[in-house]
A protein has these predicted regions:
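Regulatory sensory and allosteric helical modules in signal-transduction proteins
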Residues: 46-96
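Sensory-domain boundary capping and coupling elements
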Residues: 109-122
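Short hydrophobic/aromatic beta-strand element in the GNAT-like acyltransferase core
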Residues: 40, 105, 117
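Intrinsically disordered, low-complexity terminal regulatory regions
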Residues: 1-54, 138, 143-149
Length: 149
């Protein structure tokens, strides 16, 4: 992956647009284009009590996710990145797509306040590496500073 180029492209894509939905929509489409072996990428936005489906690319998804459920809920509740090599081994996993095997979820935080999560699923086991995580942390940093600030 050409990480620095992708980061510059995303920054350019979102920096002059103020609409959050438009920016998150384009970000999910952008990630869907550049990431291999994924079957879902998108956002869940925190409404103060639960995660609500936001812009995404992939099959129809669960609309409401309580913070006590699933990989997304765990990442949101603990405000930390979680990589799951095998979602079927994750207690409380919410199976929106039975084809998903691994998942990475990154919280979106502004001044330590939860705004939502970036969720990416793959049909491959152990799809997401530490390199992917570090790259996606940079993506989330752009989201936090260019979209939610």
């Amino acid at each position: 992956m050409h990480m620095n180029l992708f980061l510059k492209q995303l920054t350019h894509l979102v920096e002059d647009e103020e609409n959050i939905i438009a920016n998150l929509s384009n970000t999910s489409a952008f990630l869907n284009e550049i990431l291999d072996e994924i079957n879902w990428v998108g956002f869940y936005l925190f409404d103060g009590k639960e995660l609500i489906l936001g812009p995404f690319q992939g099959k129809v998804a669960c609309i409401h996710i309580p913070l006590e459920k699933g990989v997304c809920g765990y990442a949101a509740r603990h405000k930390k990145v979680i990589r799951v090599d095998d979602v079927h081994q994750f207690e409380g996993h919410i199976a929106c797509d039975s084809q998903s095997r691994s998942e990475i979820v990154l919280p979106i935080l502004v001044n330590d306040e939860l705004k939502g999560v970036l969720d990416i699923d793959s049909p491959s086991y152990k799809r997401f590496t530490i390199e992917d995580e570090n790259f996606l942390k940079e993506i989330v940093h752009i989201i936090e500073t260019k979209i939610f600030m």
